[in-house]
Amino acid sequence: MNKTTNGWINGFIGVLIFSGSLPATRLAVSDFDPLFLTVCRAAIAGVLAGGLLLIFRQQHPAKRDLISLLVVAFGVVIGFPLLTALALQHVTSAHAIVFIGLLPLATAVFGVLRGGERPRPVFWIFSAAGSLLVAGFALIQGGGSSPLGDAYMLASIVVCGLGYAEGAKLSRRLGNWQVISWALVLSLPLMLPLSFFFTPDSWSAIGVPALLSLAYVSLFSMLIGFVFWYRGLAQGGIAAVGQLQLLQPFFGLLLASVILHEKVGWALVAVNIAVIMCVAAARRFAK
């Protein structure tokens, strides 16, 4: 397989892992405070990431990379987890998940601004069409819409797109898993003490589903998923592979339906087919 194909495969695996993030977060915030969930998942992942960096004896990033790593940390370690956790206090995960379809545009825009990519104009047409399909589906599907919850989700998309694009640019120099690992380690001096500060008064009231969800978002959403995702973006291009994010809402909706028993209508099938067509077309015109 060539480099581009490998990029799409790695990106797809990353999307599958990320698809479980919002359903897991929805379960977690039923028992955990959003602030504790955010800092604790980052602290757990940061400790593990630091261990990996030591075991594999990775060199420290150059000083010129520190600002970019802080941008990644702001976007994907702190901003996105916190904003989505806050949003899921106001809307269902099924409603929140469809906003993830707007991530490709945010990632592509920041890829142009920060990564120097220049996709063809037709790419933007299909990218916008796919995102509009997802946004339209979100409005039609409803599911407990809240203006505040929607605002949190939109803000999370912006900061996450920035973090994705910045991380993909860095991964070409530092390596894919090294980027998120260093971002987590840089966040650790803040996240670790805050996780103790926001620790629940009593753990007896915390259910097993919430604990398992905390483990999932800490290990998979914060670390393992990014290993595949950043590798995919670096190999296949930020704008091109980023379009796979359009599929994430529909994998997530399936999980929300199965795990959380949230209602998902049959209109999902038609929208999913249309979005996949947009992904295929955007891929063709990405470069």
UniProtKB/Swiss-Prot annotation:
The gene is ydeK. It comes from Bacillus subtilis (strain 168). The keyword Membrane applies. SUPFAM superfamilies: Multidrug resistance efflux transporter EmrE. The chain crosses the membrane at residues 4-24, 36-56, 66-86, 93-113, 122-142, 148-168, 179-199, 208-228, 237-259, 264-286. It is found in: Cell membrane. Keywords: Cell membrane, Membrane, Repeat, Transmembrane, Transmembrane helix, Transport. Residues 16-139, 158-284 form the EamA domain. One of its GO terms (cellular component) is plasma membrane. This is Uncharacterized transporter YdeK. It is a multi-pass membrane protein. Pfam families: EamA. Belongs to the EamA transporter family.
